Design a protein with these regions (language model features):
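Hydrophobic alpha-helical segments of multi-pass membrane transport proteins
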Residues: 171-175, 319, 373-404, 416-431, ...
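Membrane-interface loop-to-helix entry segments
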Residues: 134-186, 220, 243-248, 373-386, ...
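Helix-loop-helix junctions that connect adjacent transmembrane segments
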Residues: 7, 42-43, 122-133, 162-297
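C-terminal membrane-solvent junction of multi-pass transporters and transport-like membrane proteins
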Residues: 6-8, 12, 163, 331-338, ...
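Extracellular loop-to-transmembrane helix junctions
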Residues: 29-132, 246-249, 451-460
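Membrane-interface "cap" regions at the ends of multi-pass membrane proteins
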Residues: 1-47, 53-60, 67-69, 470-545
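Helix-loop-helix connectors at the membrane interface of multi-pass transporters/channels
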Residues: 1-4, 75-78, 105-135, 171, ...
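TM-loop-TM module centered on a large, flexible mid-protein loop between adjacent transmembrane helices
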Residues: 75-77, 82, 114-119, 123-124, ...
Length: 545
């Protein structure tokens, strides 16, 4: 029987996790907004990578290799800052996904005709869309279907993500590079000056800072797939590898795609909705195939599918894992036969659907959308402040805990990387709260703008606090959950604190009762094991997964 259960263990490859990471962060459709800034966009992307993307990847890699049990961000923040903040991170992530997709959904309706060979009709429709509610309903049905697919298990949506990114981002990017070279070789003049001076951003006070913040935010999400770390055969080695490959691929998709768009389309002709399709048409025309844009548009849909299934699964998967430890009512904890929290996932897509219809049907809703978008930004970046803070604190609280990957430079390196991440996150939070120039027409006044955002943030954090307090007064623990206790619980502490133990978390969590139940095998805070034991622990057996 044991062998049979082991054979059912579902694993995903490094390639699959890498593509899942890339689908969360990068896509050619995201490049259009930055193409307004020409070659200077390279500088913005480089600054964003140095100040936020790389620190996030480095920190997530260390945390995942030191604390590779189920839970992702919940595990890491819980080890460093406690259960309350850990639950807050998961709920922020879950709400962020629901709100973000709900707000973005109505914009898809205007581009529906680009899936047909009539480019001119597609442009006219994008400029003056009709039957938007009906078309949006079609997209929402597609999203519900993709959520249904995501409930079929990690292996199913991992394959969707893998092939979706390859077909929908990497192959179109290669085609763009080749055809852009042909386009230039045919004697076409680039729409931007190609010189080192073009790399220097034009200073426009708050406008320049806001753009930088937008680039930082475009890099968020690479850590989300830590939810699936136990589906890797050797998570301590494979997770960092997937993270670093993801960083390189995402950066290349951002930079190369953005520069090609800026070269092909003059700044004044760039349209957020359909400029990417225009680029595909222009490039296709260089080889006598203007209809090529339609092929690439359908390919981009594959990337959208990858993004949706990964987003619909990741946050709910982590929340469902933690929920069984006593943090969610039993109804939300229930998993289907594929071990997916289907009820949580359908609740999330239902909320997204409601928001999408509200955004589309309520008149003069622009101000509401702006406020909701900025609230999401503030909450999501606060999530990263907590992650970076937990990382630094764990360097002091659990200095000897083995991590197969460690941010180099000792405590100085930890403060440098974590500090840059915290400062970048706070910088973006301040810019999100800072009233934009169009605030009067969209919201009313700067005071109302700032007040509403802060109130909405407080409401979400309040919901997190109330749910955590309720969990302490209700017996929501599932005794059959597979969520390991925090190390500080195993060591007999009431909350995270300083210990000198060097026992790997894989050893400490083995054969323990699940979180929320009495500790079965306690360890002392100063327990020590040999180097040989530590090395052996880096190759977990399937039963530990």
């Amino acid at each position: 029987m044991a062998d049979k259960s082991k054979s059912k263990q579902v694993y995903i490859s490094v390639l699959a996790l890498t593509m899942m990471n890339v689908s969360m962060v990068a896509g050619l459709a995201n490049d259009v907004q930055q193409s307004f800034y020409g070659l200077a966009s390279i500088t913005y992307f480089a600054i964003g990578a140095i100040c936020f993307f790389i620190p996030t990847a480095l920190v997530a890699a260390e945390l995942a290799t030191g604390w590779s049990q189920r839970g992702g961000i919940f595990r890491w923040v819980g080890e460093g800052l406690g259960k309350g903040w850990a639950l807050t991170c998961l709920l922020i992530l879950w709400f962020e996904t629901m709100l973000n997709f709900g707000i973005a959904m109505p914009s898809f309706t205007a581009t529906v005709l680009f899936y047909t060979p009539n480019y001119d009709a597609a442009v006219k429709f994008a400029q003056n869309p009709q039957h938007e509610v009906l078309i949006m309903t079609g997209f929402i049905i597609l999203y519900w279907f993709l959520t249904f697919l995501a409930t079929k298990g990690v292996k199913a949506f991992a394959n969707l993500a893998k092939y979706g990114v390859i077909i929908g981002s990497l192959i179109p990017l290669v085609v763009m590079i080749i055809l852009a070279i042909v386009w230039v070789a045919q004697g076409h003049q680039p729409a931007i000056p190609i010189s080192p001076k073009g790399l220097i951003p034009k200073w426009n006070c708050m406008g320049t800072l806001a753009l930088a913040a937008g680039v930082f935010f475009s890099y968020t999400g690479i850590d989300m797939n830590a939810a699936h770390i136990k589906q890797l055969r050797h998570p301590e080695k494979e997770f960092p590898k997937a993270m670093f490959i993801s960083v390189i691929l995402a950066f290349l998709i951002f930079v190369i795609g953005t520069v090609i768009i800026a070269i092909i389309v003059p700044e004044k002709q760039i349209n957020i909705l359909y400029t990417l399709f225009t680029v595909f048409r222009v490039l296709g025309s260089t080889i006598g195939m203007p209809w090529l844009y339609m092929v690439l548009v359908w390919a981009l849909l594959c990337n959208t599918i990858a993004m949706v299934v990964t987003n619909m699964a990741g946050p709910s998967f982590m929340l469902g894992q933690a929920g069984g430890s006593g943090f969610l009512p039993h109804w939300f904890q229930k998993k289907n036969k594929h071990k997916m929290p289907a009820r949580l996932m359908y609740t999330q897509i239902a909320g997204m659907t409601i928001i999408a219809y509200l955004v589309k049907l309520i008149p003069n809703v622009e101000g509401f959308v702006v406020l909701l978008t900025q609230t999401i930004t503030v909450l999501y970046l606060f999530y990263y402040v907590l992650m970076f803070t937990a990382f630094i604190k764990l360097r002091y609280d659990q200095p000897n805990r083995p991590r197969s990957f460690k941010v180099p430079g000792g405590k100085f390196g930890a403060w440098l990387v974590g500090g840059i991440g915290i400062i970048s996150s706070i910088f973006c939070i301040v810019l999100a709260i800072y009233p934009p120039t169009q605030v009067k027409s969209e919201v009313g006044s700067p005071v109302v703008y700032v007040s509403v955002i802060l109130i909405l943030v407080a409401v979400v954090l309040g919901v997190c606090f109330v749910l955590y307090q309720l969990s302490k007064h209700h017996n929501w623990v599932d005794p059959n959950n597979k969520f390991a206790p925090f190390t500080w619980e195993i060591e007999g502490l009431k909350k995270p604190g300083k210990v000198t133990s060097n026992v790997p978390t894989t050893i400490m969590s083995k054969d323990q009762n699940p979180m929320g139940m009495p500790i079965k095998r306690p360890y002392k805070p100063d327990a020590q094991v040999s180097e040989d034991v530590i090395k052996k622990s880096e190759t977990p057996s399937p039963s530990e997964n």
